[in-house]
Amino acid sequence: MSKYDSHLKCSFCGKSQEQVRKLIAGPGVYICDECVDLCNEILDEELLDTSGAAAQPAPKSEPPQKRRARSSNLSLSQIPKPREIKKYLDEHVIGQDEAKKVLSVAVYNHYKRLAILQSKGSGKNGDDAVELQKSNILLIGPTGCGKTLLAQTLAKILDVPFAVADATTLTEAGYVGEDVENILLRLLQVADLDVEEAQRGIIYIDEIDKIARKSENPSITRDVSGEGVQQALLKMLEGTVANVPPQGGRKHPYQDCIQIDTSNILFICGGAFVGLEKVVDQRGGKKSIGFVQPGEGQSKEKRAADVLRHLEPDDLVKFGMIPEFIGRVPMVAVVDPLDEEALMAILTQPRSALVKQYQKLLKMDNVQLDFKPDALKAIAQEAYRRKTGARALRGIVEELMLDVMYELPSRKDVTRCTVTREMVEKRSTAELLVHPSSLPKPESA
C-alpha cells in the first residue's frame, strides 16, 4: 500500500476510508459501503414504483405512525381548529395573542390545502378551478419574546413534519457555508427520509433578519450571506423542485440527490429586525407627526412594537430585504416584547415553567421548593433589565440555585426550601442549607 492510500475518499459522499466500513475501488473512482446501500435503496424504490407499490408490504423499518399518516385521508373533522391550536399554544407560551392567531389560522389553512390536494388526487373534488395558494409567514419581534418557542410548540401538536433552521449558517451556492437546500434536508430527516411526507411539512427559518443585505443600494461586491441567500430562497419559498444532497453539505455533479417539491411546504420566518421601527418612524414623519407617541409610562420596547404595527413592505426593503423575498412572505405578525408582568407569568404559568422544572428536580431529592411572590418579582425585574427577554430567566435562576443544587443531594436534613427576594438580590441561598439544629430555638411560653 502506498503512502497516499490513507487519504482515499469516496467519490460520492467524500468520506475518507477511516470513516466507512469498506471502500471499493474502480477505474479512478472509489465508492463506500454506505453509498452502495443508498444506491440499492433507490433501485428498490424504483422497482416498487414500476411493479405496483400498493401491492407490496411496507418496509419493516418504517414507523407505523408514518404508514398511517400516508395512508389516511385528511378530512375537516380531523384537522385541528384554529381555536384548538391557539389553546395549546396558550398552555406553553405567555401572551403574543396576535402571533398565535396568525400561526393558528395559517396552520389550519395549510391542513385544508393538503386535504384539497389529497381529494383532487383521488378524484373526489370536482371544484378544480379554484387553487389555494400558500401564505408564508414572517414573525417580527425582539430577542427572547417567544418566536422560536412558538414554532417549537407547534411542532409538538402537528401531524405534519416540522423542522427548524437557522438562516445565519446559510451562504450563496459556491461559498463556504450551507446551501439553502440543507433546510429541506432537515425536514426530510424529521420525516424519516419520506419524501412524500416532507412535501406536506412546515419549516421555521430563524434569524431571517440576519440575511438582510448590508446596504439599501446595490454593491459591486457580492453579498454571499445576505442578498445572495435571499435570492436562493425565492424559488424554495414560492414552490420548486429542489435537489437535496442526502448526506448534507455541498452538491457536486456526480452526487445522487433527492428531489423535493416545495409547493406545499409552509415556511415561517422569524427575526428580531433591530432598528426596523426607526425606518417605519422615519416614513411616518419626525417628532410630533410620527405614528405612535410615547404613552405615559410606556417602555421603549413597547413603543417600538406599536410602531411596527404600521409596517409596510417598503420599510422591509429599506431594512435590507429584497422586494421579491417580501412578496413571497405576505403574512406579517409582530411579536410583543415581554414586560415584567409577562416575565413573572413565564416563571410559573406555562406547563413546563422554569419554577416547575426546578421543583421537579428537587422533588427527586425529597425536597419541596417554594418561591415567594416577591422573589419571583425580583427575578422578573432583573431579567427585564438584562434586555434579553425570557432567556435571561433561566440564567438568573441557575445562578441562584447553583449552591442549592450542589449541596442538597448530599443533605438528608433539609426537606423544604423557600426562596425570598433577599436571596435573589444577594445571590445567596446559604440560609436554605443551614442545619435545623443550628437554628435558634423558639422561646418557650
From Swiss-Prot:
<dbReference type="GO" id="GO:0009376">
    <property type="term" value="C:HslUV protease complex"/>
</dbReference>
<comment type="similarity">
    <text>Belongs to the ClpX chaperone family.</text>
</comment>
<dbReference type="Pfam" id="PF06689">
    <property type="entry name" value="zf-C4_ClpX"/>
</dbReference>
<dbReference type="GO" id="GO:0008270">
    <property type="term" value="F:zinc ion binding"/>
</dbReference>
<feature type="binding site">
    <location>
        <position position="10"/>
    </location>
    <ligand>
        <name>Zn(2+)</name>
    </ligand>
</feature>
<dbReference type="InterPro" id="IPR004487">
    <property type="entry name" value="Clp_protease_ATP-bd_su_ClpX"/>
</dbReference>
<dbReference type="InterPro" id="IPR050052">
    <property type="entry name" value="ATP-dep_Clp_protease_ClpX"/>
</dbReference>
<dbReference type="InterPro" id="IPR003959">
    <property type="entry name" value="ATPase_AAA_core"/>
</dbReference>
<dbReference type="GO" id="GO:0051082">
    <property type="term" value="F:unfolded protein binding"/>
</dbReference>
<dbReference type="GO" id="GO:0016887">
    <property type="term" value="F:ATP hydrolysis activity"/>
</dbReference>
<dbReference type="InterPro" id="IPR003593">
    <property type="entry name" value="AAA+_ATPase"/>
</dbReference>
<feature type="binding site">
    <location>
        <position position="13"/>
    </location>
    <ligand>
        <name>Zn(2+)</name>
    </ligand>
</feature>
<feature type="binding site">
    <location>
        <position position="32"/>
    </location>
    <ligand>
        <name>Zn(2+)</name>
    </ligand>
</feature>
<keyword id="KW-0479">Metal-binding</keyword>
<keyword id="KW-0067">ATP-binding</keyword>
<dbReference type="GO" id="GO:0051301">
    <property type="term" value="P:cell division"/>
</dbReference>
<dbReference type="InterPro" id="IPR038366">
    <property type="entry name" value="Znf_CppX_C4_sf"/>
</dbReference>
<keyword id="KW-0862">Zinc</keyword>
<protein>
    <recommendedName>
        <fullName>ATP-dependent Clp protease ATP-binding subunit ClpX</fullName>
    </recommendedName>
</protein>
<dbReference type="Pfam" id="PF07724">
    <property type="entry name" value="AAA_2"/>
</dbReference>
<feature type="binding site">
    <location>
        <position position="35"/>
    </location>
    <ligand>
        <name>Zn(2+)</name>
    </ligand>
</feature>
<dbReference type="GO" id="GO:0005524">
    <property type="term" value="F:ATP binding"/>
</dbReference>
<dbReference type="GO" id="GO:0046983">
    <property type="term" value="F:protein dimerization activity"/>
</dbReference>
<keyword id="KW-0143">Chaperone</keyword>
<feature type="domain" description="ClpX-type ZB">
    <location>
        <begin position="1"/>
        <end position="51"/>
    </location>
</feature>
<dbReference type="GO" id="GO:0051603">
    <property type="term" value="P:proteolysis involved in protein catabolic process"/>
</dbReference>
<comment type="subunit">
    <text>Component of the ClpX-ClpP complex. Forms a hexameric ring that, in the presence of ATP, binds to fourteen ClpP subunits assembled into a disk-like structure with a central cavity, resembling the structure of eukaryotic proteasomes.</text>
</comment>
<dbReference type="InterPro" id="IPR019489">
    <property type="entry name" value="Clp_ATPase_C"/>
</dbReference>
<dbReference type="InterPro" id="IPR027417">
    <property type="entry name" value="P-loop_NTPase"/>
</dbReference>
<feature type="region of interest" description="Disordered">
    <location>
        <begin position="53"/>
        <end position="76"/>
    </location>
</feature>
<dbReference type="Pfam" id="PF10431">
    <property type="entry name" value="ClpB_D2-small"/>
</dbReference>
<dbReference type="GO" id="GO:0140662">
    <property type="term" value="F:ATP-dependent protein folding chaperone"/>
</dbReference>
<comment type="function">
    <text>ATP-dependent specificity component of the Clp protease. It directs the protease to specific substrates. Can perform chaperone functions in the absence of ClpP.</text>
</comment>
<keyword id="KW-0547">Nucleotide-binding</keyword>
<feature type="binding site">
    <location>
        <begin position="142"/>
        <end position="149"/>
    </location>
    <ligand>
        <name>ATP</name>
    </ligand>
</feature>
<dbReference type="InterPro" id="IPR046425">
    <property type="entry name" value="ClpX_bact"/>
</dbReference>
<dbReference type="InterPro" id="IPR010603">
    <property type="entry name" value="Znf_CppX_C4"/>
</dbReference>
